[in-house]
């Protein structure tokens, strides 16, 4: 059996990324305060369709993701279909793979095209850290169920007497891993210690990310892939990511205290991604349908891979496991790539993965390879800045990475690019795209 992955349909047509779009990304409780992930998802899909000048009823499938899900609308994909003028018979379902969610939605639509079930689909993801499912304590939840069954006033009073004042307090969404109790920041701190990553190196990477993102915006490179978002009640709009430190100075990073290990830590708010609101989407077609409709795709999917590792130790190493698998399936080596886009959840996590890309010992012990994945050429790496600057709406990041690398490859005359990310639960994702 060949190791090569055939990302084509039965007619031998490649999977075309026709276009991609995102909202600006905004820090929690700023420009998108009060705007749900669903509303942002509808916003970006509507605009994607408008820019493509494609009849919404031509969309055969929409797969969309959300990490912080709202109980009122658990199938965000279907609600987007119903809210954007698509045919009501359009297939739609939702996925979640933590920070790799929109990698998953993209692959799901691609695989539907590969099997011949459809020719046109939309994938993406959205998350809001400003509109959250605030819950109740387990004791209060239990009592509320019992109250619904109570038949008399005496029974109701008996149930209320079981509750204390602390049981009535609202419960925000958990920030820790369910299985380990560790937050992502604590895991990043763990990785900084495991791989001896200094505070200075973390701060330097964050400064690089913000500096490059500022230059990218100022050069007008993101105009095609970031929409202007008009926010209810439509008296204001946002047209640029608002997390970027446009006057980033390296020396200012050293002033912040560690956020997760106050005494001995090195992970700070400045070298981590903030809680972010935003949405993104890509329009996918079979190569034949794209050409028949007159589109020039921004790229094609060459290969992809998903991996999983243990969650108890350094679980944000996903890129180091998924990337070599995606490269193998594409018949490539790291040095063959024109560009590399790696999700920067934390500077520590990013630097740990970069270090392991070049480690022969890691390759032998963890990957069963006789050579390292390869040393990363920084002239190819996150050349427009990364998540540390742009922000990280969990489910939206994957399609941001894919769209961004495709557009940059276009500007450079084509080539191949890697988009890769770690994700909670020890998950990893990688996708290789080719651009003509």
Curated annotation (Swiss-Prot):
What positions constitute the catalytic site? 99, 392, 422
Query: Its Gene Ontology biological processes?
Result: fatty acid beta-oxidation
Q: Does the keyword Electron transport apply?
A: no
State its Enzyme Commission number(s): 2.3.1.16
Principal localization reads cytoplasm
Recorded GO MF terms = acetyl-CoA C-acyltransferase activity
Database matches in SUPFAM superfamilies: Thiolase-like
The UniProt entry, under PROSITE patterns, shows: THIOLASE_2 (PS00737), THIOLASE_3 (PS00099)
Short name of any one Pfam family annotated for the protein? Thiolase_N
* Known catalytic reactions: an acyl-CoA + acetyl-CoA = a 3-oxoacyl-CoA + CoA
* The keyword Cytoplasm is assigned to this record: yes
Q: Which UniProt keywords apply?
A: Acyltransferase, Cytoplasm, Fatty acid metabolism, Lipid degradation, Lipid metabolism, Transferase
The UniProt entry, under CDD domains, shows:
thiolase
State where the protein is found: Cytoplasm
Any one GO CC term of the record: cytosol
Q: What does the record give as its pathway?
A: Lipid metabolism; fatty acid beta-oxidation
The record describes its quaternary structure and partners as: Heterotetramer of two alpha chains (FadJ) and two beta chains (FadI).
Q: What does this protein do?
A: Catalyzes the final step of fatty acid oxidation in which acetyl-CoA is released and the CoA ester of a fatty acid two carbons shorter is formed.
Family per UniProt? Belongs to the thiolase-like superfamily. Thiolase family.
Identify this protein by name: 3-ketoacyl-CoA thiolase
**Protein species of origin:** Shewanella pealeana (strain ATCC 700345 / ANG-SQ1)
Whichever gene encodes this chain, its name is fadI
């Amino acid at each position: 059996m060949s190791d090569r992955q055939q990302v084509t349909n039965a007619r031998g047509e490649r999977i075309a990324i026709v276009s991609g779009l995102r909202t600006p990304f905004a820090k929690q409780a700023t420009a998108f305060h009060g705007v749900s992930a669903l509303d942002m998802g509808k916003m970006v899909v509507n605009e994607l369709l408008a820019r493509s000048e494609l009849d919404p009823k031509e969309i055969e499938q929409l797969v969309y993701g959300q990490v912080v899900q709202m109980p009122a609308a658990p199938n965000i994909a279907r609600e987007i279909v119903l809210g954007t003028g698509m045919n009501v018979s359009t297939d739609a379902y939702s996925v979640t793979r933590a920070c790799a969610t929109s990698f998953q939605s993209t692959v799901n639509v691609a695989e539907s095209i590969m099997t011949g079930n459809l020719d046109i689909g939309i994938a993406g993801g959205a998350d809001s850290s400003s509109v959250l499912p605030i819950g109740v304590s387990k004791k209060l939840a239990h009592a509320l169920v019992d109250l619904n069954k109570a038949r008399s006033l005496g029974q109701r009073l008996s149930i209320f007497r079981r509750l204390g004042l602390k049981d009535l307090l609202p419960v925000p969404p958990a920030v820790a891993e369910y299985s380990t109790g560790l937050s992502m920041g604590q895991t990043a701190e763990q990785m900084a210690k495991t791989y001896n990553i200094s505070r200075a190196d973390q701060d330097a990477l964050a400064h690089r990310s913000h500096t490059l993102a500022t230059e990218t915006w100022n050069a007008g490179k993101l105009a095609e892939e970031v929409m202007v978002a008009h926010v209810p009640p439509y008296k204001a709009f946002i047209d640029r990511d608002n997390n970027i430190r446009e006057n980033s100075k390296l020396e200012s990073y050293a002033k912040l205290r560690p956020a997760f290990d106050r005494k001995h830590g090195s992970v700070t708010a400045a070298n981590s991604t903030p809680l972010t609101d935003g949405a993104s989407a890509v329009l996918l077609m079979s190569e034949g349908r794209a050409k028949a409709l007159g589109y020039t795709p921004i790229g094609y999917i060459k290969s992809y891979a998903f991996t999983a590792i243990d969650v108890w130790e350094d679980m944000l190493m996903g890129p180091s496991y998924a990337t070599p698998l995606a490269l193998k399936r594409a018949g490539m080596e790291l040095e063959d790539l024109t560009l590399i886009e790696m999700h920067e959840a934390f500077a520590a996590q990013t630097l740990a993965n970069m270090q392991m890309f070049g480690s022969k010992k890691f390759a032998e012990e963890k990957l069963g390879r006789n050579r390292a994945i390869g040393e990363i050429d920084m002239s190819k790496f996150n050349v427009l800045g990364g998540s540390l600057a742009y922000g990280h709406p969990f489910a939206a990041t994957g399609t941001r990475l894919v769209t961004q690398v495709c557009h940059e490859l276009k500007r450079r005359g084509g080539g191949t690019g890697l988009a890769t990310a770690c994700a909670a639960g020890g998950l990893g994702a990688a996708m290789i795209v080719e651009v003509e």
